[in-house]
């Protein structure tokens, strides 16, 4: 497994599943250049998904033209209640990728988006989606089976501890390390660990704040985050979503600096942590997460843990672009990004109703004002998931 995986959710022409005659030559020419550079640089792993619009179809038309004997092909299919529907989607992916024509298989098949216990049940129940995947595996049409997840830590651990999967795709970056126990659990089971979208979900590092650029110097924030992630025990590969060949450049710089990670990372980490402490204080950093109800148990389904995390990122490192995108997605992300933002406060949710569920939080008195400031700074823009846009 290479250190970087070429992610297939940035290079495609469209997020809608366009027919082949509508795929433009310019889009295919761009993708071919990306594939050729990826092969030349050792990015042998390609990761796409059934619902990445035209991604699978475009890849299927080009993989035979850009040969790579070391290629590892991964696609992802979401779990559903009806396993026949799951198998139909799997067949469609294999067809779009034109595997039979090349005598190839899906090397890595992910059950895509096990984000709650209901979806885990659809996957694991007798006769469910996992059994379909395992049948394809026994027939030689699938190599290894894993899962991708945006779930809460407890649910990720539950899925890992089933011992049903060979690898996991999850979120873990410098700005978000709460899934560390999941990585440890995966290591204990000799599972592969794939980090999802470290550049985008790691803080919009493609458009970093001036503050973050200053704190990460002399490295670009992308390079710093890549080095941090790749230096972590148990992390095997990072997704690199490229819209053009040059999008590989900073990530390849990180690879070249990996032997110096122990020298380069500590001073940057010290500056980042000092900035957090100066902006927020140790009391907040040590205790802000304590006593917060989960979003289903909060009036208006306000996702307090996530919103207060965004507040911390905003105050410490000015991650406004990232914060605005995450804030706007709350309420529109379904099980991929559950809960709601603070817009309901003072509207359908009163301060008294909110305080009633914050009895165990040491910051109960401050939280309503924090949410109002966050709403003022980040609100006003509804955001949809890329597939919805």
Residues of each region from the PLM?
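Short hydrophobic/aromatic-enriched beta-strand-loop microsegments
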Residues: 70-73, 164-172, 259-265
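Alpha-helix-loop-beta-strand connector modules within alpha/beta enzyme cores
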Residues: 56-75, 129-140, 195
């Amino acid at each position: 497994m290479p250190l970087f995986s070429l992610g297939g959710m940035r290079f495609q022409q469209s997020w809608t599943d366009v027919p082949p005659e509508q795929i433009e030559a310019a889009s295919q020419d761009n993708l071919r250049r990306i594939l050729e550079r990826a092969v030349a640089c050792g990015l042998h792993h390609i990761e796409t998904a059934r619902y990445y619009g035209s991604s699978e179809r475009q890849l299927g038309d080009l993989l035979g033209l850009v040969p790579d004997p070391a290629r590892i092909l991964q696609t992802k299919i979401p779990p559903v209640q009806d396993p026949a529907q799951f198998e139909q989607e799997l067949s469609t992916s294999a067809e779009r990728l034109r595997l039979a024509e090349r005598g190839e298989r899906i090397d890595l098949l992910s059950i895509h988006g096990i984000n709650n216990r209901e979806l885990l049940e659809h996957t694991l129940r007798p006769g469910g989606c996992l059994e379909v995947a395992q049948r394809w595996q026994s027939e030689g049409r699938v190599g290894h089976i894993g899962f991708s997840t945006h779930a809460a830590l407890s649910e990720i651990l539950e899925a890992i501890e089933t011992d049903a999967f060979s690898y996991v795709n999850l979120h873990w970056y410098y700005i978000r390390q709460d899934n560390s126990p999941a990585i440890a659990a995966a290591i204990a089971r000799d599972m592969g660990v794939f980090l999802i979208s470290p550049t985008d979900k790691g803080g919009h590092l493609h458009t970093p704040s001036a503050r973050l650029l200053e704190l990460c110097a002399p490295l670009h924030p992308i390079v710093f985050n890549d080095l941090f992630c790749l230096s972590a025990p148990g992390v095997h590969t990072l997704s690199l979503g490229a819209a053009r060949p040059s999008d590989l450049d900073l990530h390849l710089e990180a690879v070249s600096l990996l032997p110096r990670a122990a020298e380069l990372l500590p001073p940057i980490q010290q500056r980042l942590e000092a900035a957090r402490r100066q902006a927020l204080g140790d009391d907040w950093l040590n205790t802000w997460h304590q006593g917060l109800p989960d979003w289903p148990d909060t009036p208006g389904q306000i996702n307090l843990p996530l919103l207060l995390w965004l507040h911390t990122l905003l105050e410490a490192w000015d991650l406004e672009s990232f914060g605005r995108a995450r804030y706007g997605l709350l309420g529109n992300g379904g099980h991929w990004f559950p809960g709601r933002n603070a817009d309901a406060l003072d509207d359908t949710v009163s301060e008294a109703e909110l305080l009633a569920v914050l009895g165990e939080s040491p910051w109960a008195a401050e939280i309503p004002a924090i949410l109002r400031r966050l709403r003022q700074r980040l609100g006003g823009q509804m955001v949809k998931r890329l597939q919805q846009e």
